[in-house]
Amino acid sequence: MALAALLGILHRGQVEIRTAQLPFTLGGQRFAAGSYVVVLRQPYAAFAKTLLEPQHYPDLRVSPGGPPTPPYDVTAHTLPLLMGVAAVPAPDSLRLPLSAPVEPPGATPGYPGFGEGQAPRIGLYRSYDASMDEGWTRWVFDTWKVPYQPLVDSVVRAGKLKEQFDAILLPDQEPRQLLDGLPKSYPAPYPGGLGSEGARALRQFVEDGGTLIALNQASRFVMDQLLLPVRNVLEGVPDDDFYAPGSIFRLDVDTAHAVAKGTPAHNIAWFENGPAFEVVDSTAVRVIARYPADPDKVLASGWVLHPERVAGRAALLEVHLGSGRVILFGFRPQYRGQSIATYPLLFNSLQLR
């Protein structure tokens, strides 16, 4: 599915895609006949090159010897990394017979375990203080045929959530917005957020055996409100001491964990204003993925200031609480419907029993 999606994006951008007609070797790797090839001698080569290669930013400074000039917006859009597809640059000297331009293959999105009669009962929290990430999550779920029910503040605050759901997902949203929601000047039922009553109901849901999943900044809300034995090492750190305005980081993954089933030991994470975790009580917490211990290996594409702040830190955790569990993501595994490489981490989390 990921390969078809990547090729489809290139094709919609009018990039010519060809296939190798014979097996070939490149960079010590053997590629079969039929492998897809994008030749950069074509009108839309720059578009293809921009999407296929990692982004490396120049070292721009405010003044000679001064602090770096941070980028304005997100800094990475390397589709092979985001989608988990191998893309290998070839030298100009490579010569091999190629097909005429081809159409990308078709593929139907779907993931095992979400079929009728086997899918968990999923509640997707929908704040009245609208979250863009919640919209992207709905789009991903609808596209990949993941069944879910929208979950609003009043339903959460009413409690007895385990009677209705097996898993509840909180998309990326600032803790203040989750807790307080919209101001009281709005008409009912829109004012207020989850509040302390909703936080208590979520904790009870987990203690009763449910799975609560929090993405990116929502993890900070869950850590604080459910009093989890986890600390965010980036809490209170100013932008001039750590900054990553939307970058692709490398992940080292514990593939023995059920959340990481079917994923590679080395994956990626879309990092944007997320937490990085330190475990306070290891008897209740299991690290599923962490950033590389070497600061120079944290960044895969984009820009980061002081990567040593997150080097070796946990990026994905399971916290046991009562009869259930909390899954904390320090990144966005379904980032804008692009990061197919980390979809399985989210989908597997929803299916934990």
Region locations from a protein language model:
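Intrinsic-disorder/low-complexity accessory segments
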Residues: 1-296, 300-353
